[in-house]
């Protein structure tokens, strides 16, 4: 079955529910780190989508605003169905440093990866799977048969055991991380902040197959907002559990995660832990305020309060907040209001970002930024955590946690390592 939507034709057909879009990447001849494509996978997205062969490629360096660039690009896109349903849209990422175009921040940490702060593509083709339905979206007038033929060439992803890695380097180490926690607690006692999220970066050599690595991570740590980004010079594979912001019609929502126990510890203990509840409550208030900057007055509400979600190595406390977008606001206004996520900065957000810049020795780059897709009146963007960045023969994995007044430095260090454990395991490395 086919249908026209704006300037595109969407061809739908039934499938047996086992179609693997990641396996289609090599069949299409796409090379991670060379070709530009975006894969979104996980039940949180509502569909798995592969977007490729850019008609336009938006690359923004630090001297230009990625938010204005997005607004200009969206102005050229027709009102259409959601990009996750085959409509026109932009697929890509904002790095954490895109926040420098929202707030005046110091420049202290080393920008050693030197990646663009934002890249989005307007794809010529998208392929999507939802349940037992598959669709191929092509420009109006084009036939989908060439893409259909590629499915016949797709082979299942093979799970290869990684070669063991003897050395894992950390940007901070246990001593440095614990010193950072102690410094944050001093800022809290002085009344500067209530909570700060601090992170460390692990790196290991990696020359393996990137598609296989993605398959391994997806198997070890399945997640609702995962996927793969590929742009010239680097790739990123993600098992993110967290939604930054969604816009569907005029309904805006966010789903913050704050509060973590290692998997295997008592879930009720997590929900009753004063430190974890305090962390979550502060972030919940921050996210309500952020959403309120773009929502119509009086519409912001908590839809779900302090439930738990369990992943391969950790259990989190999660809530959901929603509101109606104000009449004078658009998707980019909403994204700017929510960015970067409060769960990965702390409260109050701007002062926390200043402290993060002071304490973390290297820039976060993609980590704690956001990737996903935007349409004319729709948006789904995650938070880039539980993600491996691959560049020039090195794999980078970052993890951290929220520090509050009664945080215990050694425990916070162990929590950050637990969050990185699934990533390091896929790389053949043992947590330090």
Regions found by a protein language model. Name each.
Residues 1-432:
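Extended alpha-helical targeting/anchoring segments
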